[in-house]
Amino acid sequence: MWTGQNIAYDYDAAHNSADLSIISLEAILNNGMKTTCGGFANFYSALCHSQGIYCLYLKGGSSSEGYSRAQLAEAPANHTWNAVALDGQWYYVDCTWISDLGVENGIVSGGENIKPFYALFGFGEMSIEHRIDRSEHICYGG
């Protein structure tokens, strides 16, 4: 939940097609701890890797843009989040959705409404609002 409490969602970057210059670890740390969902998932993957936790970077559709559960199957890939393996079980983590902390037009807002539900949730819960299209294991350093 640290990421959701300390990294802000960059609405300006999201409106302007965020790329690697926004979601890389260096960009997050050097640009005022703000990013888009890709950066949240990238940062969380790095944290897990540093602790020896197997973590996947997931990309797919989500209900974040107003898609209903029925529409989710056909929705474009519009979101990234993570899956972690803990004690032989898979759990899902959506750091973007954990907090409402955001930056738009240089103004920081939110941060009061932490949603721990998105910290370690199961496949059934995940599949209500997320659709996995692709998964990657990203390795950081040696």
Segments from the language model and where they lie:
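Short linear motifs in intrinsically disordered/low-complexity regions
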Residues: 11, 17, 95, 106, ...
